[in-house]
């Protein structure tokens, strides 16, 4: 578009130059014919010659003013093109330095079963069972029940303290998100010397990777170093709804993070008074929704658009310089013709 406008302006300016040259030549021929008709002995009047010179001077002034304005316009266009080039390069560098975070969601039919690492301490696991949508009423709370979950006990050294041993109960998490699968666990703590009772837990992305790992202790040390841990208290049923976030790092690696929403419901203890001294813990793990959130940094700077814009700006600079050069030549040529005709008129009068 810029190239077409500039080409059209160039053609119009060339046509104006040719018209000015033709008009000047025709004026010279008319003057010569007038001198030949009047003869060598006839001298035109001083008033007519002065009026003719004044008209020509006015036309030359207008042409010079027009040429100067045209040059100023082209210089302004050149300044705008230079600023556009500078701004384009600056924006491109800023976009390279500051990528934009992109968030997308991928729907899945089922998840890879996560690992649930529980640190019960002195608490005892009473029951662990997979349910779908609804948890049936407790038949005998505080008493051992069904255990149809895949679990494994493991002891390992704390990753931040070599003198502390960690004892973890690893439970396979839910998979069927569309069927609203959930895992319900019940613990019992007989005696505790602490003022507050709670059980720590952490979530990691794949229970299968844990089972296939030759160094399970090292695997759990890495998980405890990378993931955050949470707690659920006794005397309540804590419902944990999990969601998975995958973040793509700058080096191409993919980091997995669990986000969770918890809701706590008070447990109405209807056991006999003799059994109420035993603290009960209830926890439910369920997927929040079937969408995996993927986060990555993207660079919005498009090099091809930048190159195209720079090419257009440089083309505008080139055309503006060409027009300015042509305008200067035109102004010099008009000035020379004016001086030449002025000299001829002076010689003719003398």
From Swiss-Prot:
Gene expressing this chain: Pacc1
Keyword Phosphoprotein: yes
Function: Chloride channel gated by pH that facilitates the entry of chloride ions into cells upon exposure to extracellular acidic pH. Involved in acidosis-induced cell death by mediating chloride influx and subsequent cell swelling.
Sequence ranges on the Extracellular membrane side: 86-301
Subcellular compartments: Cell membrane
Membrane topology: Multi-pass membrane protein
Entry protein name: Proton-activated chloride channel
InterPro entries given in the database record: TMEM206
């Amino acid at each position: 578009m810029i190239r077409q406008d500039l080409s059209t302006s160039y053609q119009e300016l060339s046509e104006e130059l040719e018209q000015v040259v033709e008009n000047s030549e025709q004026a010279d021929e008319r003057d010569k014919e007038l001198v030949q008709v009047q003869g060598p002995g006839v001298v035109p009047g001083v008033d007519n010659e002065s009026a003719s010179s004044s008209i020509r001077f006015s036309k030359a002034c207008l042409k010079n003013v027009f040429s100067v304005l045209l040059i100023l316009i082209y210089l302004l266009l050149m300044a705008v093109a230079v600023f556009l080039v500078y701004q384009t390069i600056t924006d491109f560098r800023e976009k390279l330095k500051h990528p934009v975070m992109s968030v997308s969601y991928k729907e899945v039919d089922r998840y890879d079963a996560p690992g649930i690492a529980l640190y019960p301490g002195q608490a005892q696991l009473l029951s662990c069972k997979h349910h779908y949508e609804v948890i049936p009423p407790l038949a005998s709370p505080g008493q051992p029940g069904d255990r149809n979950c895949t679990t494994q006990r493991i002891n390992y050294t704390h990753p931040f303290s070599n003198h502390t041993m960690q004892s973890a109960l690893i439970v396979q998490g839910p998979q069927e998100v569309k069927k609203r699968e959930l895992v319900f666990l019940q613990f019992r703590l007989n005696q505790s010397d602490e003022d507050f009772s709670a059980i720590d837990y952490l979530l990691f992305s794949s229970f299968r990777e844990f089972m296939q790992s030759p160094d399970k202790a090292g695997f759990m040390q890495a998980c405890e170093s990378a993931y955050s841990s949470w707690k659920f208290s006794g005397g309540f049923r804590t419902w944990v709804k999990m969601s998975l976030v995958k973040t793509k790092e700058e080096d191409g690696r993919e980091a997995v993070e669990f986000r969770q929403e918890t809701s706590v419901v008070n447990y109405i203890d209807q056991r006999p008074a003799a059994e109420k001294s035993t603290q009960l813990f209830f926890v439910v793990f369920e997927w929040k929704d079937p969408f995996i959130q993927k986060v990555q940094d993207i660079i919005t700077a498009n090099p091809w658009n930048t190159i195209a814009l720079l090419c257009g700006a440089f083309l505008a600079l080139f055309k503006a310089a060409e027009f300015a050069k042509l305008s200067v030549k035109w102004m010099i040529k008009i000035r020379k013709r004016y001086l030449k005709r002025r000299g001829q008129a002076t010689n003719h009068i003398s």
